[in-house]
Amino acid sequence: VNTAILIPARLASTRFPNKMLAELDGVPLIQRVYNRCKETELPTYVVTPDNEIVDLIGKDNAILVGDAENGTARCSLAADFINYENFINVQGDMPDITTNIINDVARLLGTYSVVTAYTKMSDDKRSNPDSVKIIHNGQTAKWFGRGITGYGDHHLGIYGYRNYILNDYGNLERYPEEEIEQLEQLRWIQNDVKMGVVEVEFNGIEINTKEDLNKWQKQV
């Protein structure tokens, strides 16, 4: 199936400004994520409002878009410029993303129009608001939240979309919970779009804060 990877990235991160350019073992974060995604041999594009990121990745591999409310909306804008049936959205803070995870998400798009991934969550992460929890029944997602404690699995920042559903994202109703939780994926759930889920193996670090960056460096 005609599939491309989109990596939404911006410099104006609230918790960690210029995070995308922060170096991990001498390589900028967004470059490292891009390199990992390219290992799949799927066409890969960084989607960004920032010329600095375009200059780093190269104009042939980046799509410059205007203002967007979140990463999914950014990907929806980018989908207008390139012609693919399916898209995989990999967050720009995942330097340890693997080909296996991307392939697992892509495969499930044969069944669902929107897909995401999760991994089992350790007890210490369950009380951490930076760790997004997913409630699911093993087949589809039922809810996402940061403040959930004591149950749920760890939601990974990767999604799969069929082209038509991604294009429709901006037309879906936005509910208060999306704003409160700061979780754009709630829009699918609250508009009754079935989101397929797949359990994956992931032992890496997602770079949300400078502390995460330091933790990653120590593991190298």
Regions found by a protein language model. Name each.
Residues 152-220:
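Conserved alpha/beta core of the MobA/IspD/sugar-nucleotide pyrophosphorylase nucleotidyltransferase superfamily
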Residues 97-175:
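Conserved core of the sugar-phosphate nucleotidyltransferase
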Residues 51-107:
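Short phosphate-binding loop-to-helix
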Residues 1-4, 82-83, 109:
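Catalytic phosphate/metal-binding cores of nucleic-acid and nucleotide-processing enzymes, i.e., regions
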Residues 41, 84, 110-114, 193:
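Short, high-confidence coil segments that cap the C-terminus of an alpha-helix
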Residues 2-48:
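N-terminal glycine-rich phosphate-binding loop and ensuing alpha1 helix
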